[in-house]
């Protein structure tokens, strides 16, 4: 039985284009949608099981990538955006009309400061980097997912070619650890 991981993953992965130059994200509002323009492709696109990321209705995971904040601009209806949790490291900017998260920005000192987190599924353009891995997989249990089905979740990710982690993937965890060591002058 197939689990509803995410609409963009449920039928396998669509490969992105190495030459993709970006596009527009739009919230789900039928009139006056918030529009965010991305002037490039994302990196480190991944399925995320954390409790903070926005997920489409019925999905167990979100799919989220990062892009330099200089390549992100709100191009329509910015007045509808609000920050979901101002105390969070990632300031998730969501639409007050439909609740969709358009981008997350880190304003405080952090290893990923300068990168914005975005959901490319909100774009009608094709060519975005495909998901590379699944992160924070066990976190879905904290949101009510049945722990006895975790092997099935991991098997389904494996069947579409994605490794699963209960944090980020090793290169990103290495980047965080390197940043932390540098700050501590180790």
UniProtKB/Swiss-Prot annotation:
PROSITE patterns: CENP_V_GFA. One of its GO terms (molecular function) is S-(hydroxymethyl)glutathione synthase activity. Gene3D superfamilies: glutathione-dependent formaldehyde- activating enzyme (gfa) (3.90.1590.10). Coiled coil: none annotated. It is an enzyme of class 4 (lyase). Zn(2+) 2 binds at residues 48, 50, 53. The keyword Cell inner membrane does not apply. The keyword Lyase applies. Its cofactor is Zn(2+). Zn(2+) 1 binds at residues 27, 29, 95, 98. Binds 2 Zn(2+) ions per subunit. Residues 20-166 form the CENP-V/GFA domain. Keywords: Lyase, Metal-binding, Zinc. It catalyses: S-(hydroxymethyl)glutathione = glutathione + formaldehyde. It comes from the Eukaryota. Its EC number is 4.4.1.22. Signal peptide: none annotated. Pathway: One-carbon metabolism; formaldehyde degradation; formate from formaldehyde (glutathione route): step 1/3. It holds the Pfam family GFA. One of its GO terms (biological process) is formaldehyde catabolic process. InterPro entries: CENP-V/GFA, Formald_GSH, Mss4-like_sf. NCBIfam families: formald_GSH, PRK05417.1. Catalyzes the condensation of formaldehyde and glutathione to S-hydroxymethylglutathione. HAMAP family: Formald_GSH. Belongs to the Gfa family. This is Putative glutathione-dependent formaldehyde-activating enzyme.
């Amino acid at each position: 039985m197939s689990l509803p991981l995410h609409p963009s993953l449920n039928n396998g992965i669509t490969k992105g284009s190495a030459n993709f130059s970006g596009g527009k994200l739009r919230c789900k509002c039928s009139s006056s949608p918030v529009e965010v323009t991305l002037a490039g492709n994302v990196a480190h696109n991944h399925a995320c099981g954390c409790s903070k990321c926005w997920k489409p209705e019925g999905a167990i995971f979100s799919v989220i990538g990062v892009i330099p904040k200089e390549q992100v601009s709100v191009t329509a209806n910015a007045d509808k955006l609000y920050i979901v949790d101002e105390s969070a490291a990632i300031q998730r900017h969501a639409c007050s009309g439909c609740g969709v998260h358009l981008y997350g920005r880190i304003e405080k000192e952090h290893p990923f400061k300068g990168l914005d987190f975005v959901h490319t599924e909100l774009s009608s353009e094709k060519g975005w980097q495909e998901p590379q891995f699944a992160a924070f997989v066990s976190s879905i249990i904290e949101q009510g997912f049945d722990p006895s089905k975790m092997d099935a979740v991991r098997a389904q990710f494996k069947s579409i070619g994605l490794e699963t982690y209960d944090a980020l993937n090793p290169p990103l965890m290495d980047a965080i650890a390197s940043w932390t060591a540098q700050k501590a002058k180790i």
